[in-house]
């Protein structure tokens, strides 16, 4: 019964607007308090933004930079609120973290023309390591259109001699809302999750960053194409069909004229 309830809850959350995720998740937990741990660990929530007290730069919050009620900034490597014994990445991972944050800032500006990004790394018990790349871009409300893009990429790396195995899990949450006098209010949103694994040669940590960068870039490109062609394309078709029902009689007349012209041309050919 518990597994069935969890599956139904996850299926429901996939169909609800991402911008209301916090409220919907709270309501689900109230309905099924015994599923609280599973729901919190399974459901991706829209990313929240904080500002580094030392540098003033913005960064994104997630479970992987959290220790208790404090969050670690990727810029100063300090916790807010301050935490004396908070978990910190090893020197090797911290160096990679600094380089990755700089690289994905450039990636974010190139593909999203702004927004906020954060990268965090940590060591795994099996000798490998893992990281998470977060990107958030909010719409500016121009032309009465608001919205937000959140992408979450969790990647696990296992080194084998001069080879590395990469396992990537990517989630994109997107919502758009238009409010125009001519068309009224329309909400469009949802989430998409994909996984991908690959093996690649390595020389040093810079090779890791290059491999991860290409992998994430390719994954985001494919997911963006899927969202654009399948989800937005299907919505556009549905809206077009709804609008065309008012002129159904005119369309039928046009079809009849086309058939008559085709028949006339066919008879002339005979």
Swiss-Prot record:
<dbReference type="InterPro" id="IPR037282">
    <property type="entry name" value="CapZ_alpha/beta"/>
</dbReference>
<dbReference type="GO" id="GO:0051015">
    <property type="term" value="F:actin filament binding"/>
</dbReference>
<dbReference type="GO" id="GO:0000578">
    <property type="term" value="P:embryonic axis specification"/>
</dbReference>
<dbReference type="GO" id="GO:0005737">
    <property type="term" value="C:cytoplasm"/>
</dbReference>
<comment type="similarity">
    <text>Belongs to the F-actin-capping protein beta subunit family.</text>
</comment>
<dbReference type="Pfam" id="PF01115">
    <property type="entry name" value="F_actin_cap_B"/>
</dbReference>
<dbReference type="InterPro" id="IPR042276">
    <property type="entry name" value="CapZ_alpha/beta_2"/>
</dbReference>
<dbReference type="InterPro" id="IPR019771">
    <property type="entry name" value="F-actin_capping_bsu_CS"/>
</dbReference>
<keyword id="KW-0009">Actin-binding</keyword>
<dbReference type="GO" id="GO:0051016">
    <property type="term" value="P:barbed-end actin filament capping"/>
</dbReference>
<keyword id="KW-0963">Cytoplasm</keyword>
<dbReference type="GO" id="GO:0008290">
    <property type="term" value="C:F-actin capping protein complex"/>
</dbReference>
<keyword id="KW-0206">Cytoskeleton</keyword>
<dbReference type="GO" id="GO:0010591">
    <property type="term" value="P:regulation of lamellipodium assembly"/>
</dbReference>
<dbReference type="GO" id="GO:0005869">
    <property type="term" value="C:dynactin complex"/>
</dbReference>
<protein>
    <recommendedName>
        <fullName>F-actin-capping protein subunit beta</fullName>
    </recommendedName>
</protein>
<dbReference type="GO" id="GO:0030036">
    <property type="term" value="P:actin cytoskeleton organization"/>
</dbReference>
<comment type="function">
    <text>F-actin-capping proteins bind in a Ca(2+)-independent manner to the fast growing ends of actin filaments (barbed end) thereby blocking the exchange of subunits at these ends. Unlike other capping proteins (such as gelsolin and severin), these proteins do not sever actin filaments.</text>
</comment>
<keyword id="KW-0117">Actin capping</keyword>
<dbReference type="InterPro" id="IPR043175">
    <property type="entry name" value="CAPZB_N"/>
</dbReference>
<dbReference type="GO" id="GO:0000902">
    <property type="term" value="P:cell morphogenesis"/>
</dbReference>
<comment type="subunit">
    <text>Component of the F-actin capping complex, composed of a heterodimer of an alpha and a beta subunit.</text>
</comment>
<dbReference type="InterPro" id="IPR001698">
    <property type="entry name" value="CAPZB"/>
</dbReference>
<dbReference type="GO" id="GO:0051490">
    <property type="term" value="P:negative regulation of filopodium assembly"/>
</dbReference>
